[in-house]
Amino acid sequence: MDTIGHHYIVEAAGCDPNVIGDANKIREIFLEAAKRGNMEVKASYFFKFSPMGVSGVVIVAESHISVHTWPEKGYAALDVYTCGENADPEKAVDYILEQFKAQYAHVSEIKRGIEEEDRTFTHTILTWEERLDRRNGKP
């Protein structure tokens, strides 16, 4: 089944508020995640809300990595979308969750742009949950 893109939608919980509340730290994490996922960075923008929370995006040649955070809840809404065959969005997601020190992740992988016989497009969705123990240095 050929697909134009892979879109990961991640609900990350139990994240370190000091990490997900720091726009500069998230930018560093996303730039490294793009590198690890074999993505070519084109631009980035991050905004720190008052009193807390960050929204940001890294535009990559293959599509984007974006986030909205709620440090007071330890929650981050993460999106990683890539097109093409060379990028590895799952590596980027894994690295971001590790750096956010997420305790839990609900992940949906959407295979987008699946061409139908009548030249329309559809998608498939695979969803899973992971309990993570990252705060104690365990993967």
From Swiss-Prot:
GO terms for biological process: spermidine biosynthetic process. Is synthesized initially as an inactive proenzyme. Formation of the active enzyme involves a self-maturation process in which the active site pyruvoyl group is generated from an internal serine residue via an autocatalytic post-translational modification. Two non-identical subunits are generated from the proenzyme in this reaction, and the pyruvate is formed at the N-terminus of the alpha chain, which is derived from the carboxyl end of the proenzyme. Catalyzes the decarboxylation of S-adenosylmethionine to S-adenosylmethioninamine (dcAdoMet), the propylamine donor required for the synthesis of the polyamines spermine and spermidine from the diamine putrescine. It comes from the Archaea. The keyword Ribosomal protein does not apply. It holds the Pfam family AdoMet_dc. It comes from Pyrococcus horikoshii (strain ATCC 700860 / DSM 12428 / JCM 9974 / NBRC 100139 / OT-3). This is S-adenosylmethionine decarboxylase proenzyme. Belongs to the prokaryotic AdoMetDC family. Type 1 subfamily. The record marks E62, S63 as: Cleavage (non-hydrolytic). Its EC number is 4.1.1.50. GO terms for molecular function: adenosylmethionine decarboxylase activity. Heterotetramer of two alpha and two beta chains arranged as a dimer of alpha/beta heterodimers. GO terms for cellular component: cytosol. Pathway: Amine and polyamine biosynthesis; S-adenosylmethioninamine biosynthesis; S-adenosylmethioninamine from S-adenosyl-L-methionine: step 1/1. Gene3D superfamilies: 3.30.160.750, S-adenosylmethionine decarboxylase domain. It is an enzyme of class 4 (lyase). Keywords: Autocatalytic cleavage, Decarboxylase, Lyase, Polyamine biosynthesis, Pyruvate, S-adenosyl-L-methionine, Schiff base, Spermidine biosynthesis, Zymogen. Signal peptide: none annotated. The gene is speH. It catalyses: S-adenosyl-L-methionine + H(+) = S-adenosyl 3-(methylsulfanyl)propylamine + CO2.
